[in-house]
Amino acid sequence: MGQVLPLVTRQGDRIAIVSGLRTPFARQATAFHGIPAVDLGKMVVGELLARSEIPAEVIEQLVFGQVVQMPEAPNIAREIVLGTGMNVHTDAYSVSRACATSFQAVANVAESLMAGTIRAGIAGGADSSSVLPIGVSKKLARVLVDVNKARTMSQRLKLFSRLRLRDLMPVPPAVAEYSTGLRMGDTAEQMAKTYGITREQQDALAHRSHQRAAQAWSDGKLKEEVMTAFIPPYKQPLVEDNNIRGNSSLADYAKLRPAFDRKHGTVTAANSTPLTDGAAAVILMTESRAKELGLVPLGYLRSYAFTAIDVWQDMLFGPAWSTPLALERAGLTMSDLTLIDMHEAFAAQTLANIQLLGSERFACEVLGRAHATGEVDDSKFNVLGGSIAYGHPFAATGAWMITQTLHELRRRGGGFGLVTACAAGGLGAAMVLEAE
């Protein structure tokens, strides 16, 4: 066991997570069509503060993230402060770590708490796959800049004459890695082939995810942590996530064609997480501040770790790299965990990470560790389903996972929970949570 790094303030206070909330998650171009991420962020933070009944002046910092950036609102965090009735003097800044963005937001607020610069803050994220920054071609962009500087009409017309019809076509946001040109689905396919993850195994995990998510809603387990969203034209509120298949059937998964490697692939739209709209946030404060306010924390942040690996192969192994670090810093092992919640970007990626967590060879030859991180107990793993079922509003996923895991830990009488995710760019995140 390496060095344990306690997450406490100078006064010995633990980092308490006192409340968490999310919007229902909606598939792209459905219930939240036309609602930008900044409005989703305002929605969830406003409701979170209203439910918590914490005075606005208590919150000293808001760190929020957005992966699909909107040029008109580059600092989503500050816009949320100004749009929710929070104290205008509240410090607010935005972060981005791809799919681990709200993990980063939580870590940043925790670091401010440990440094003693604040005693309470909000962390979270929001994304919309339905409101996208549709751009223009590089050639058109250059011409438009030059036209703005041209002094005469003839100069402007001459510049426009350089354009061809194809230069006028809109350019959607890139879905491939900037550095490699590879899509995440391409990497998931590569991992499936390299580590022997079959189509049947992937479909089975997706089916399991939908079944468990549907059961969680049916049992009423998510009502406390998911708000009802009222959206224009305010005729029909969104109460639950709309991606979950309540009648999920393995036979239906087998009918779908591969989405990335059309001839020999196993990754499909059904065993991958869908493009999603939504927002999530958590309130963190020092343990003593929570006691002063008479608040009972959902739980505590025990440790966290971020890692980075090469992007050309196995880019989505973030959990396999970050989990042992987070456990080490918490002074725990896999067997000490009550719950394990891993972001299901793709069933192939999830199953490959599970495989490597239990691999002695990977631990010794790649991580330089004496032993494997540990086998993942299926009875502890994604017990309420995962991203394949709920969806994945990129920047919101971490805050949602933290909130859901803490609520489930409390239902089970407390214990330790691991939340972990891969992210674009070869990044990984893991956090160990504790509930009493």
Swiss-Prot record:
Q: Name one GO cellular component term.
A: cytosol
- The Enzyme Commission number assigned here is 2.3.1.16
One Pfam annotation reads Thiolase_N
Active site at C99, H392, C422
> Where does it reside?
Cytoplasm
Q: Report the pathway entry.
A: Lipid metabolism; fatty acid beta-oxidation
GO biological process annotation, one example: fatty acid beta-oxidation
> What domain of life?
Bacteria
What SUPFAM superfamilies does this protein map onto? Thiolase-like
Catalytic activity as recorded in UniProt: an acyl-CoA + acetyl-CoA = a 3-oxoacyl-CoA + CoA
User: Which GO terms fall under molecular function for this chain's record?
Assistant: acetyl-CoA C-acyltransferase activity
What InterPro entries does its record include? Ac-CoA_C-AcTrfase_FadI, Thiolase, Thiolase-like, Thiolase_acyl_enz_int_AS, Thiolase_AS, Thiolase_C, Thiolase_CS, Thiolase_N
Q: Which NCBIfam families match?
A: AcCoA-C-Actrans, FadI, PRK08963.1
Family per similarity comment: Belongs to the thiolase-like superfamily. Thiolase family.
How it assembles, according to the record, is: Heterotetramer of two alpha chains (FadJ) and two beta chains (FadI).
Can you name this protein?
Answer: 3-ketoacyl-CoA thiolase
